């Protein structure tokens, strides 16, 4: 039939020419559906290959899906709807399709829900409209242009100005390739007006050109820094792995050992072989230094991929990857699902980081899925960390991963000295408030709120940095009572000494905002989120109370919403804003800034902060966990951990492991160059295994204790866990479904089901939540067990059962 669309470039036909006039194909749609739908291929339409993107009708709308195979043939052809056409987009590569199927099966999720992550930018599925370009005109046109300038037919444009000659030289170096005007001007080192004038004179020919983005290619042969013997041995190991197909490798190195430069060598070798490389970072949107280091090493920036990119940037990045024009991608976990035509290496940096686990939608761990993606593609996956997860360590011990170790800091720098400050013996001291403008002067923190929070400080005892006060009466408005401090005398002295030496200090407190809890001193009411089982966190900088789970916010009230008493609300416990308030009082001459995810909101802000720290425009940084990852600031010689015990409490399986990793990482920010560093950790429990391991400088000491405890309980990595989270707006329905799942719980050797119980976050975003936890022996295949379990219970409308295989959060 005339006018039917042709296949996009890169596709081939699925069916032979003598096949039935209207063959049937299975099309997977990016929707949470049970499987692919059958569609017929109209007579005369090109017959698509597996992986081809197609437009199909779905109800009254049109969707773009992917041909997943031949149709099942269960529906009569006359009842099938026909394909509409093909978007101008390369087909999904076979390894990506296999990966989508694997992830869906492993996570017990619909394959269409996984496909949606691969087709996350619908606008990228169509080619951009062609744009105007310029190229060298034909000989006849060139002569006409010269005559128009009064030059006559002089050969070679001898009378052209030097700038115009450079423009034509660029075009001669790329015969037949049209340039955008701005690109041509940049390559020839002329202004845009020169190109415009040449076009008007007929010296350039206007043509339409593809508007696809082609990022500058990194130079794999650009010389890198001289590697140490340890680095060279590790780099050789990675290069060897590139010759051997799939393998998993653990690149473990102490903080400052130069792991990045080692895996840069593997990226360079991958580029020499003409293949693509992917680097996953836990918070790429906030990692300002990594792209700079890459550009310094390879002479070009990597293609970035993360959620804070604008729609246009995501569109062009997605298509650049799909068209093979993105040699190196650095991204967040979702970059795993980009359509690489020839991926040859995956690096997972900071592989231990919990940010690699997606909790919403399709729950998956990008660290583990990266290894699967590499296995399906037949190339290496490198997991890099100074504090590897216990799961990764166990895989290395069992021989599943090759273990490469960098035991020393690069360049002769020494590891920092770590000292525990026992707050029971040297508690923080109170301080008298003065006028306070906060870091950055008028643009910093807001001034304290008055008598209500001062009253709390006057009454509450200070045994711990996170102690909560008891309600008390308001003092006289004329009083200037002492406030609770969060910095102990030894830490204050160390900060003063470091600042006096012209060096920088990082005070670490992994808690955003001003105070984690606000209560009424009159009636004891605690301000809670109306949509979640969580306290509202005060953010005094902008006068708001915020829920850190759902995003709800409200102004800080002047009266208690429960009893109506005015000026009775008191903040409890410290956040980074409150710590900054004390630091500004104790170190008034220090230039100070706060680094948290709500103050450093994206790549530009992160880059600006990193530049200010590197240029020593800041003396004292007060930061959360975003300061613990990958930063290299040679002048930071003191790290003070304000609350080392934060995160150790609660029933989280990995609480101790995560605390050890985080504190070890933040300690690694100290003394990364020729100046020695020291780390002071405030704690009320210096005998805790985490604290003892940190003080000893021997992470293996902690891992040995942690592994023994997990193995005794058959917990991961020595056992399997699957969480079922039942949620809905109707509490009774949620409880009924949870109870039904409890009654239908699987039984058998190596299986145990805990629950149902209300989740610790019993309400989240207005939905009631219950949990069950399937605990299984290491060798049990849990997915068939879970599928059968779910099939035994009818799930009513409005109730959702979320399956989380290998959970890391138990909220």
UniProtKB/Swiss-Prot annotation:
Superkingdom of origin organism: Bacteria
Pfam families hit by this protein: DEAD (PF00270), PriA_3primeBD (PF17764), PriA_C (PF18074), Zn_ribbon_PriA (PF18319)
Cofactor: Zn(2+)
Catalytic activity: Couples ATP hydrolysis with the unwinding of duplex DNA by translocating in the 3'-5' direction; ATP + H2O = ADP + phosphate + H(+)
Any one annotated GO CC term: primosome complex
Amino-acid positions noted as binding ATP in the UniProt annotation, renumbered to this chain: 253-260
Keyword Lipid biosynthesis attributed: no
Family, per entry: Belongs to the helicase family. PriA subfamily.
Species for this entry: Rhodospirillum rubrum (strain ATCC 11170 / ATH 1.1.1 / DSM 467 / LMG 4362 / NCIMB 8255 / S1)
InterPro entries: DEAD/DEAH_box_helicase_dom, Helicase_ATP-bd, Helicase_C-like, P-loop_NTPase, PriA, PriA_3primeBD, PriA_3primeBD_sf, PriA_C
One of the GO biological process terms: DNA replication initiation
The protein's name in its UniProt record: Replication restart protein PriA
Low complexity: bias regions: 135-152
Keywords: ATP-binding, DNA replication, DNA-binding, Helicase, Hydrolase, Isomerase, Metal-binding, Nucleotide-binding, Primosome, Zinc
Location of the motif DEAH box: 349-352
Compositionally biased intervals (Pro residues): 460-474
SUPFAM superfamilies: P-loop containing nucleoside triphosphate hydrolases
Record's cofactor remark: Binds 2 zinc ions per subunit.
Residues binding Zn(2+) 1: 520, 523, 560, 563
Residue ranges of every copy of the Helicase ATP-binding domain listed in the record: 240-406
Function: Initiates the restart of stalled replication forks, which reloads the replicative helicase on sites other than the origin of replication. Recognizes and binds to abandoned replication forks and remodels them to uncover a helicase loading site. Promotes assembly of the primosome at these replication forks.
Coiled-coil regions listed: none
Subunit structure: Component of the replication restart primosome.
Domain Helicase C-terminal: 490-709
Lineage: Bacteria, Pseudomonadati, Pseudomonadota, Alphaproteobacteria, Rhodospirillales
């Amino acid at each position: 039939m005339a006018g039917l669309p042709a296949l996009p470039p890169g596709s081939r036909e699925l069916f032979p020419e003598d096949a039935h006039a209207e063959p049937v194909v299975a099309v997977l749609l990016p929707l949470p559906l049970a499987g692919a739908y059958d569609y017929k291929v109209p007579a005369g339409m090109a017959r698509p290959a597996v992986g081809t993107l197609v437009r199909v009708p779905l109800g009254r709308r049109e969707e773009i899906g992917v041909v997943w195979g031949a149709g099942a043939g269960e529906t009569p052809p006359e009842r099938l709807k026909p394909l509409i056409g093909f978007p101008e987009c390369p087909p999904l590569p076979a390894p990506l399709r296999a990966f989508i199927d694997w992830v869906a099966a492993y996570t017990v999720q619909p394959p269409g829900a996984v496909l949606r992550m691969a087709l996350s930018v619908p606008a990228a599925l169509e080619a951009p409209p062609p744009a105007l370009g310029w190229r060298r005109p034909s000989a006849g046109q060139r002569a006409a242009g010269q005559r128009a300038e009064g030059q006559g037919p002089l050969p070679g444009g001898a009378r052209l100005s030097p700038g115009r000659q450079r423009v034509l030289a660029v075009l001669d170096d790329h015969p037949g390739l049209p340039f955008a005007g701005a690109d041509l001007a940049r390559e020839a080192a002329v202004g845009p007006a020169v190109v415009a004038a040449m076009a008007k004179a007929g010296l350039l020919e206007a043509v339409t050109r593809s508007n696809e983005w082609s990022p500058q290619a990194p130079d794999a042969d650009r010389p890198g820094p001289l590697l140490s013997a340890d680095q060279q041995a590790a780099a050789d190991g990675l290069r060897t792995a590139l010759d051997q197909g799939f393998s998993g490798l653990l690149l473990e190195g102490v903080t400052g050992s130069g792991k990045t430069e080692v895996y840069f060598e593997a990226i360079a070798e991958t580029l020499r072989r003409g293949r693509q490389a992917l680097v996953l970072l836990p918070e790429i949107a906030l990692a300002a230094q990594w792209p700079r280091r890459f550009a310094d090493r390879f002479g070009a920036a990597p293609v970035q991929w993360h959620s804070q990119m604008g729609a246009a940037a995501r569109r062009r990045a997605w298509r650049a990857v799909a068209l093979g024009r993105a040699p190196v991608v650095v991204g967040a976990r979702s970059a795993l699902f980009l359509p690489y035509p020839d991926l040859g290496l995956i690096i997972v940096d900071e592989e231990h980081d919990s940010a690699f686990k997606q909790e919403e939608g399709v729950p998956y761990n990008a660290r583990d899925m990266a290894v699967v993606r590499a296995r399906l593609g037949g190339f290496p996956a490198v997991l890099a960390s100074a504090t590897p997860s216990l799961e990764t360590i166990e895989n290395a011990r069992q021989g599943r991963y090759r273990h490469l170790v960098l035991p020393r800091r690069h360049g002769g720098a020494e590891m920092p000295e770590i000292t525990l400050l026992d707050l029971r013996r040297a508690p923080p001291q109170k301080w008298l408030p003065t006028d306070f403008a906060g870091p950055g002067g008028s643009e910093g923190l807001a001034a304290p709120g008055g008598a209500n929070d001062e009253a709390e400080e006057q009454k509450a005892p200070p045994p711990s940095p996170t102690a909560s006060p008891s309600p008390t009466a308001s003092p006289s408005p004329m009083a200037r009572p002492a406030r609770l401090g969060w910095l102990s005398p030894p830490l204050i002295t160390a900060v003063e000494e470091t600042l006096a030496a012209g060096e920088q200090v990082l005070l670490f407190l992994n808690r955003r905002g001003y105070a984690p809890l606000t209560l009424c001193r009159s009636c004891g009411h605690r301000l809670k989120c109306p949509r979640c089982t969580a306290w509202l966190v005060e953010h005094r900088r902008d006068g708001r109370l915020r829920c850190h789970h759902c995003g709800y916010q409200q102004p800080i009230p002047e009266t208690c919403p429960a009893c109506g008493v005015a000026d009775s609300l008191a903040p409890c416990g410290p956040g980074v804003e409150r710590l900054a308030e004390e630091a500004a009082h104790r170190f008034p001459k220090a230039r100070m800034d706060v680094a948290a995810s709500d103050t450093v909101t994206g790549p530009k802000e992160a880059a600006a902060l990193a530049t200010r720290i590197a240029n020593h425009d800041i003396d004292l940084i007060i930061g959360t966990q975003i300061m613990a990852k990958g930063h290299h600031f040679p002048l930071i010689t003191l790290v003070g951990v304000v609350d080392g015990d934060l995160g150790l409490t609660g029933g989280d399986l990995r609480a101790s492991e995560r605390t050890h990793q985080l504190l070890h990482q933040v300690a690694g920010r100290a003394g990364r160059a020729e100046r020695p560093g020291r780390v002071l950790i405030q704690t009320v429990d210096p005998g805790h295994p985490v604290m003892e391991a940190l003080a000893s400088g021997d992470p293996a000491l902690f891992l040995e204790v942690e592994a023994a405890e997990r193995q005794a309980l058959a917990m991961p990595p020595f056992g399997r866990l699957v969480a079922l989270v039942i949620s809905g707006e109707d509490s009774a329905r949620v409880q009924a479904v949870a109870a039904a799942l409890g009654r239908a719980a699987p039984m058998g050797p190596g299986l145990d089901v805990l629950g149902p119980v209300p989740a610790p976050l019993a309400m989240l975003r207005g939905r009631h939540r219950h949990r069950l936890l399937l605990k299984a022996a290491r060798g049990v295949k849990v997915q068939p067990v879970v599928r059968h379990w779910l099939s035994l219970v009818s799930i009513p409308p409005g109730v959702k059962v979320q399956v989380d295989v290998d959970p890391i959060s138990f909220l």
